[in-house]
């Protein structure tokens, strides 16, 4: 083999070695986009439209505990796209949620939001996490569910209605309560790690914690205390009166109908402004 031939072969191998990481990254990106195109079936918009409202600016008495902006969630870390603990919703859904809250205030209760608009990148973050073996939060969030079943049982999906801006996760708090007098024990040991903390904060007992990947989270589940059943019924009734439809596998999950953006999935990050 001549010297020139050896040099050409060497340069070819060097070029291949330099370009390999880019090729792999391109394939991974194409695969991710393939998942988006296949499962979303709608437009993905990277910017926040002016028609999205910051809910707590419409009514500051709506409480907020945006878990995905912290490590207090089933992944155990802040989720991609959640740069601030802020609740955004498309305008019709935001205004309707305020109406729900105001109706509840007259009954001695108020809304607390756990998740509102969710960037598409956050859903992708959930998907990537679900495909790993990491399960540090299993005891708290899915003690009776194998992680490999999270897709099949509908707890995690490759796209989310939250990204369309009209779906919200909520609970209720009591307007008048004495934190020092808050007591009691959970009626079961499944997804109850925040029981004492939530009662001390005035949150109502719904029989399972938010984001509990378990059959106990089914809205009409029978194996609940009467108090938890009544609280779920109160929440569903109040939300339904203003156009929110409950997802029957999760007592906290509601979608405003008709959706303002039924075929659009947004991906702008959640920031203070």
PLM features: residue spans?
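N-terminal cationic amphipathic segment used for targeting or macromolecule association
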Residues: 5, 21-25
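Bacterial N-terminal signal peptides that target proteins for export
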Residues: 2-12
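Conserved metal-phosphate-binding beta-hairpin within the catalytic cores
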Residues: 254
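Extracytoplasmic cell-surface/polysaccharide-interacting catalytic and binding patches
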Residues: 25-116, 123-247, 259-273
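Bacterial N-terminal signal peptides
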Residues: 10-21
């Amino acid at each position: 083999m001549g010297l020139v031939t050896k040099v050409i072969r060497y340069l070819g191998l060097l070029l291949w070695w330099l370009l390999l990481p880019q090729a792999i990254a391109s394939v991974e990106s194409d695969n991710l986009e393939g998942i988006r195109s296949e499962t979303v079936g709608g437009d993905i918009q990277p910017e926040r439209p002016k028609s999205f409202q910051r809910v707590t600016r419409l009514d500051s008495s709506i409480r907020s505990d945006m878990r995905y902006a912290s490590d207090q969630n089933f992944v155990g870390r802040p989720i991609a796209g959640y740069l601030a603990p802020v609740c955004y919703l498309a305008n019709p859904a935001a205004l309707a949620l305020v109406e729900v809250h105001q109706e509840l205030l007259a009954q001695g209760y108020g809304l607390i939001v756990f998740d509102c608009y969710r960037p598409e990148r956050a859903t992708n973050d959930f998907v990537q996490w679900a495909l790993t073996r990491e399960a540090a939060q299993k005891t708290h969030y899915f003690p009776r569910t194998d992680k490999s079943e999270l897709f099949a049982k509908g707890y995690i999906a490759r796209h989310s209605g939250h990204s369309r801006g009209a779906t919200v996760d909520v609970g209720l708090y009591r307007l008048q309560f004495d934190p020092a007098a808050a007591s009691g024990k959970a009626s079961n040991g499944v997804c109850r790690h925040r029981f004492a903390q939530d009662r001390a904060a005035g949150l109502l007992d719904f029989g399972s914690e938010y984001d509990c990947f378990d059959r106990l989270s089914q809205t009409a589940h029978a194996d609940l205390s009467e108090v938890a059943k009544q609280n779920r019924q109160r929440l569903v009734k109040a939300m339904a009166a203003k156009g929110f439809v409950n997802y029957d596998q999760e007592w906290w999950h509601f979608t405003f109908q008709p959706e303002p953006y039924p075929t659009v999935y947004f991906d702008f990050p959640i920031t203070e402004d």
